[in-house]
Structures are given as structure tokens and as C-alpha cells.
């Protein structure tokens, strides 16, 4: 009943659902009544138009998830959920909130499904969208400079071990970074990837683990535990080239451009690992075990290079 019998010839009525209604009017005159009816079509209060994703979908970079709603959106709440690999991995980007957008930072490459729940009291409407997230590529051209790598190293406050490397072809950090670029470019690997991995593996060239500076092993090649010192190389360039070749082996099945100096390259070949990790994030659990965030940690250092 929109209005009980009243002297007022009008009233307000608030429909709660979309659809076709029949409205009945009774005009009462004592014991006599007259009647009218009218069909009223009520549209939806709001409509969920789309789930939009803005920004580059890259590992470690925030993207914006936005619910597009037309009509009266007052009182609505929005929940965003993501999953990858058939719910093998999933998470909540935003719990139910009045905000129709949120930021989500994917941590791994691959195809994700993003779920949007638009909540209106006890009612919900849903949308899904596939999002392909690109990782941090290992192969590629130089995207920074020797100066930028040197500046980052010096900003950390670490002292470059000149005494260790002066006889190995890299008396200064600038020489070291120049050799990184030379070795990396020769095999088509991004120099900043090599720099960042070397800094992560050696603690900014301070070492301290089973690998010693005079081994010129900047990526822990062959150092499978704390007791094993791993591979040994004649000079800094050879050690960096071995690291570059191991990265290339993981990233692509393409042949090496130089004579192989990586003692572990044949392991990648024999186990069918060539080309299984085109992105840094794919190295998780491969180069380092368990290494759940190994690639992300390298990418984080890359992001610090100016």
C-alpha cells in the first residue's frame, strides 16, 4: 500500500526492484468507489558497465582497478579479488568499500582473473576480467647507464673492494660496471639485470658467504650451499660473462654468442631448462631455492637505478 485512504490526492512511492508494476487507484466517496489502474515500468537504479584496468600490467607495478557504474550508485560497495592458475594463488585487492577503485600490484607474470563484486545491501552483481601481467625481461638492450649504476652503488655507502679486483681487471666500481655492460651486451642480456643480480648475490660486493671475492663469481654459480664456494673465474670479466650466459640460458633457447665460460650452462641444457625463465620473476625457485621472491628482489634493485 503506497497510501491508506486519505484526503490527499497524491503520495510518494519508492519501488525497490526493477520491473513492470501495476498501480491501483481507489477514489472513495462514502460507500461508493471508482477505480483506475496504470502500468509503470521501473528501470534499474544502477547498472554495472565495466571493470577497467589502467596502467601497464607489469610485475611490481601498481595498476588501477576501476568499477564503472551508471545510474544511482549511492550506498554501493565494491570488492576486488584476483586469482591466478585456477585459484592456485589468489588474494583480495580490496575488501568491500565505498570506493569504486583500488590499486593492485601483481608480483608474478602470467594471466590473472580479476573479480569485481558490486554489493547493494544483500544483493550483488559480478564482473570478471582477464589481465595479462608481463614480468621483468632478462633479455634486452641497455635501459640505463654506467653512471647510473655507479651512482646507485656509491649511494649505498659500501666500499668497493679495489684491492680484490685491481689485479682482476676492475680497479674501480666504474670499471666493474663498464665490464657488466660489455659482457651483457655481447649476449643480448640487459646490463641492469646483471648489475642488480650481482649486487643482490654478493651483498653489494661485500661477499661474506661461502663465495670469496677472488673467485670473481658474482652470481653464486655452483655455490649450492654454505660449504660450497662454487665456481672460480680468472678475472672479473670472465665471471660476469659466465653470469650473463647463465641468465641467457634461462631466458632463451638461443645459442650463445661467445665461447661458453659458464660451467653450469650444460646443466641447463641437460635438464631442458633453456628458455624456461624469460622474466626475472621466473627465476624464483630455479636460480635460488626456495627463492620465492628472488626475481622480485633483483627487479627492486633495478628500480633504484636512475
Task: Please provide the spans of the model-predicted regions.
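Short beta-strand segments within Ig-like beta-sandwich modules, predominantly Fibronectin type-III
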Residues: 2-7, 91-98
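A short beta-strand segment in extracellular, disulfide-stabilized domains
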Residues: 61-69
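Catalytic cores of secreted/periplasmic lytic hydrolases that degrade extracellular macromolecules
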Residues: 135-306
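Proline-enriched interdomain boundary motifs that mark the N-terminal boundary
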Residues: 45-53
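Short, solvent-exposed loop/linker segments at the N-terminal edge
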Residues: 55-61
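Short glycine/proline-centered coil/turn motifs in the loop regions
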Residues: 30, 70-74, 121
Amino acid at each position: 500500500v503506497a497510501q491508506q485512504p486519505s484526503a490527499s490526492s497524491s503520495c510518494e512511492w519508492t519501488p525497490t526492484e526493477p520491473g513492470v508494476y501495476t498501480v491501483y487507484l481507489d477514489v472513495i466517496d462514502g460507500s461508493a468507489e471508482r477505480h483506475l489502474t496504470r502500468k509503470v515500468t521501473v528501470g534499474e537504479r544502477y547498472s554495472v558497465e565495466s571493470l577497467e584496468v589502467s596502467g601497464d600490467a607489469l610485475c611490481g607495478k601498481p595498476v588501477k582497478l576501476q568499477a564503472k557504474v551508471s545510474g544511482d550508485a549511492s550506498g554501493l560497495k565494491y570488492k576486488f579479488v584476483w586469482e591466478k592458475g585456477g585459484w592456485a594463488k589468489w588474494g583480495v585487492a580490496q575488501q568491500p568499500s565505498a570506493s569504486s577503485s583500488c590499486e593492485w600490484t601483481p608480483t608474478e607474470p602470467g594471466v590473472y582473473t580479476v573479480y569485481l563484486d558490486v554489493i547493494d545491501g544483500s544483493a550483488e552483481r559480478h564482473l570478471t576480467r582477464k589481465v595479462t601481467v608481463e614480468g621483468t625481461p632478462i633479455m634486452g638492450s641497455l635501459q640505463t647507464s654506467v653512471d647510473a649504476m655507479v651512482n646507485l652503488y656509491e649511494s649505498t655507502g659500501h666500499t668497493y673492494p679495489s684491492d680484490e679486483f685491481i689485479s682482476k681487471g676492475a680497479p674501480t666500481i666504474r670499471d666493474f660496471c663498464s665490464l657488466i655492460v660489455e659482457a651483457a651486451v655481447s649476449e643480448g642480456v640487459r646490463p641492469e639485470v646483471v648489475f642488480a643480480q650481482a649486487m643482490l648475490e654478493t651483498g653489494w660486493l661485500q661477499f661474506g658467504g661461502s663465495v670469496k671475492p677472488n673467485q670473481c663469481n658474482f652470481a653464486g654459480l655452483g655455490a649450492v650451499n654454505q660449504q660450497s664456494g662454487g665456481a672460480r673465474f680468472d678475472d672479473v670479466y670472465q665471471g660476469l660473462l659466465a653470469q650473463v650466459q647463465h641468465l641467457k640460458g634461462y631466458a632463451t633457447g638461443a645459442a650463445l654468442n661467445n665461447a661458453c665460460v659458464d660451467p653450469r650452462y650444460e646443466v641447463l641444457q641437460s635438464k631442458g631448462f633453456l628458455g624456461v625463465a624469460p622474466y626475472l620473476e621466473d627465476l624464483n625457485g630455479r636460480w635460488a631455492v626456495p627463492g620465492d621472491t628472488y626475481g622480485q628482489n633483483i627487479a627492486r634493485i633495478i628500480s633504484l637505478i636512475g
